[in-house]
C-alpha cells in the first residue's frame, strides 16, 4: 500500500528527495542545451546577428519562465489528484469533476486519452534526439567520426533497453548525483563565456524578445518551433509529483536547474556573439579541446538517465491505462522487492525500442529529429492547459473569469508554440503524430470493445441472488475448500460458476463472488479495499476497490476478510475465471476492422490470473463466447 506523510519533507529527507528529483524529473529538460539553441539557427533560417541572438536568448529565458516557472511549478503542481500528478491523474480529476455533464466528460476523456497517446510519440523522440545529440559531440572532436554517430547511438540505446528487465534499483541512486554534476558543468561552461562577454546578460530583459517578434514577425514565428525545445520535459515536473512531492521539485528547479540552464544558454549566446562560426554545435564548441571527450561521456550519461526516466514513465503510464480500462492487460514484471513502482513491461519496452531505432535510422541526426519533437511536446502542453481549466472550474469551483485568467494566457502561449510546430508536420512532425494516432486508436478501440462486451454479458446475465436461491432448493454436493469466482459485473452470476455446476455438479463449502473495480483515484487504502455482503449458505458477494496506482493483488485483498466472518486458507482456495472468446459480428457495435482489432488485442492480452496476482497452481479457467 502506498503511504504518504502529510508533513512536508525537511532536512536530510528534503535534500535526498530534491537530489532524486534532479535525476528523474529534470533529466529531459536538462539535456535540451545540447540541441535547442543550435536548432534555432540551423538551416540558415535566422541570420546570426547580435539583435537576433539577443532576441532569441530573451525568448528562451521567458519561455522557461512562463511555461516552467509560472505554468508548471506555480499553477499545475497545485492540481494534484490525492498527491499524484501526470496527465492520467489530471484526466481522472477533471472527468470526475464534470461527471454530471456526460457530453463534456466524454470529450474530456477523448482529449485526455489522445494526450496520453501522444506521450508515447514523445517517448520515442526523446531518447532518440537526446542520445544522438550527445554522441554528435564526436563530430566536433574529430569530423571524421561523423559516420560513427548513428551506430554508437544505436549501441547505447540497445544496451539501455536490454538492461530494463534488471530494473534500476541498483544504479538509480546515482541518477541524481550524475545529473547534478551535469547541471554544474552546464553552469561552468556558460560562466566562462559570459565573463568574456557580460553584455549578453542584457537579454534577460523581455523587451529584446518583444522587439525581435515585432521587427521580424515571420522569423520570430518560425523560431518558436525551435525555441520550445528548451522546455521539452517540462511535463515531467507534474508527472513525477507523486514520487517526490511539490516542495523538492520546486526547490530543485529554482535552486539548481533553472539557473544552470539559463547560464548555459547565455554562455552559448555570448560565444555566438564573438564566434558566429560555432553555430554548427554551440554546446560542444563552448568546451575547451581537452574537455571534449569527458564532456561527451558525461552528456551521454545524462541523456541515458533522461531516457531512463521516460522509459520508466512509459511503463507507469501503461499500467495506469490498463487499470483504467484503456489498454489490454500486459505482462508486468516487478524489478524490486522493496519498491512496487519499479516495474518492467516487456511489450512496451521492445515496442518503444523498435520505434526509437526506426527514428534514429530514418532521421539520422538530432537536427532532423528536432522537427518531429516540437509537435508532440506542444500538443501535450495544450491538452494539459485545457484540462487544468476544467479542474480549476469544476473541481476547485473557481469563478469563470478567474479560470480564464489563470489558464487563458498559458493557452495562448501554448497555442502559439503549437502553431509554429504545426508548419513542420511534413518535415518530421508526422512521426510522433502517427505513433500517437496509432496508440489513440488502440486505446479507444479497447475501451469501446470492453464496453460492448459488458453490455452483451449484462444482456445475458442471470441475477446471482435469484440463481443461488434456485440452486439451494435442491442443493448440490458441497466439497471442502473455498471457491473464488471472478465476475466482471457485481450481482451477476459468473459463467465459471454455471460451467462448474453443469460439468462438475458440486459447490465448495465457501464461495466468494468477487468483482474487481478500478477507480479514478490514484490510491485506495486497505480500510476501503473490501466491501462484503452475505448471500447465505456460506456465499458472499465481495467488491475489491483499487486506485489506478494500487497493485491489484486479489489474494492480498481477500486476506483482509479473515476478520469478517470468512475463513480463508490459501492452500484450500481455488480461483475460477471465465476466459471469454470474442466473436466480431457485422452490424453491431464498432466498424468490423475495429472489432477484429479488439478481438486480436483481447486474444493476446495477458491472463487475468497474472495481472491479479493469483497463484497459478490454484486457478481454473473456463471459456465462453461473446459476440460484439
Swiss-Prot record:
It catalyses: K(+)(in) + H(+)(in) = K(+)(out) + H(+)(out). GO terms for molecular function: potassium ion transmembrane transporter activity; symporter activity. The keyword Transmembrane applies. It is a multi-pass membrane protein. Keywords: Cell inner membrane, Cell membrane, Ion transport, Membrane, Potassium, Potassium transport, Symport, Transmembrane, Transmembrane helix, Transport. Its main location: membrane. It is found in: Cell inner membrane. GO terms for cellular component: plasma membrane. Pfam families: K_trans (PF02705), K_trans_C (PF22776). The chain crosses the membrane at residues 56-76, 109-129, 141-161, 174-194, 209-229, 253-273, 295-315, 343-363, 372-392, 400-420, 425-445. Belongs to the HAK/KUP transporter (TC 2.A.72) family. Transport of potassium into the cell. Likely operates as a K(+):H(+) symporter. This is Probable potassium transport system protein Kup. It comes from Methylibium petroleiphilum (strain ATCC BAA-1232 / LMG 22953 / PM1). The gene is kup.
